[in-house]
Amino acid sequence: TLKSYNPDTKVNIHEEPISSLNAMEIIKDYDIIVNGADNFPTRYLVNDASYMSGKPLVDGSILLFDGQATTFLAGEGCYRCLFPTPPPPGEVPSCAEAGVLGMLPGMVGTIQATEVVKLILGIGETLSGRLLLIDALSMEYRTVKLRRDPKCPLCGDNPTVTELIDYEAFCGGASLIG
C-alpha cells in the first residue's frame, strides 16, 4: 500500500461513485483535481465541479491507440470549451467496447502526474492552453492550442451552467459508472 512506502501519506477512500449530489463535497479538500474517467458524464461532471470550485483540473483520456492530456486552469478554458456537447450515444465506443493499448494508461497517467508536480512546485510550463495528443501507433506526440470559448456555457462570458446538472441525461443516458 501507499502507507508502506510513506507512513505520512493520507489516503481518503470514497466508496460511493461521484455524482452531482456528492462531487462538490468530495473535491472540496483537494488542491488539484485529476480526472481519468472513461465516460462522458463523469468527465463533464468533474470538469464542472472543478471549475465551480476554482480548482485546477488535470485531465487525461485514452481510447484504442490514442491518448490526450491537458490541464485546465481558471480563466483559461475548460473541458466544455473543447467539447461543448457530448457525442451522441453510441457514436464513441467505450474503452470496454473498443479496447485500449495496455501501456497507454501508464503513459497518459505519467503525463498527468508530471502536470500535478509542476502545479504543486510552481515550476515549468503546464499543458494549460494546450491539448497533448498521443498516437501510440506512430509514437507521435503533438499539441494543439486550446482557448477559452467566450460562448462556453460554463466558463464563457454569459454562463448558463451555474450548478451541477444531471450528467447522465445531458450525455444521452450514458452512465456515470464506466
Question: Which residue ranges define each predicted feature?
Answer:
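Adenine nucleotide-associated cytosolic modules
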Residues: T1-G178
